[in-house]
């Protein structure tokens, strides 16, 4: 059964647990989603027990009308994608709000992944409310800076030293 839900915006004071398989179920149930915000301003010092990965983010972006996404993801590993998944592109998404999403060095891999699958992306703000105080915010600031640089010069050329 599918529904015509176009916008989901949930902001609560506690972390929300969600995994990639549940993202698949959401996309199947709500294929008309245009905007998906699930605690995009999360400011806790600990992530939920389970988070969608970059693969889950990509699956969410399959909704043909999706243009805004904000949620906490686990970006510590670049996922292995199926052939079909590796072809997914969403050109409508320009901003991706990642809250206090876990991420590790080298962040260039995350920036490459995001720009490969979201070629119109111009910004990836981390948690804007306490930038610098959250464990991952400074790494997301680097990803955001790399994406802005790539957009400005039309190139994905970075070295590990850029980090």
For each predicted feature, which ranges?
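A generic structural motif
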Residues: 124-130
């Amino acid at each position: 059964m599918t529904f015509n839900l176009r916008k989901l915006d949930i902001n609560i004071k506690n972390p929300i647990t969600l995994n990639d398989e549940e993202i698949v179920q959401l996309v199947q149930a709500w294929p008309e989603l245009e905007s998906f915000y699930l605690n995009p301003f999360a400011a806790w010092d600990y992530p939920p027990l389970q988070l969608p990965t970059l693969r889950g983010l990509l699956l969410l972006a399959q909704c043909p009308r999706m243009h805004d996404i904000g949620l906490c993801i686990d970006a510590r590993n670049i996922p292995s994608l199926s052939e079909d998944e590796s072809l997914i592109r969403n050109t409508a998404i320009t901003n991706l709000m990642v809250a206090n999403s876990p991420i590790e060095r080298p962040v260039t891999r995350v920036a490459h992944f995001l720009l490969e699958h979201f070629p119109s992306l111009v910004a990836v703000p981390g948690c804007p409310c306490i930038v610098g105080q959250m464990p991952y915010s400074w790494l997301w600031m680097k990803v955001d800076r790399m994406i802005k640089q790539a957009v400005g010069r039309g190139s994905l050329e970075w070295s590990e030293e850029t980090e």
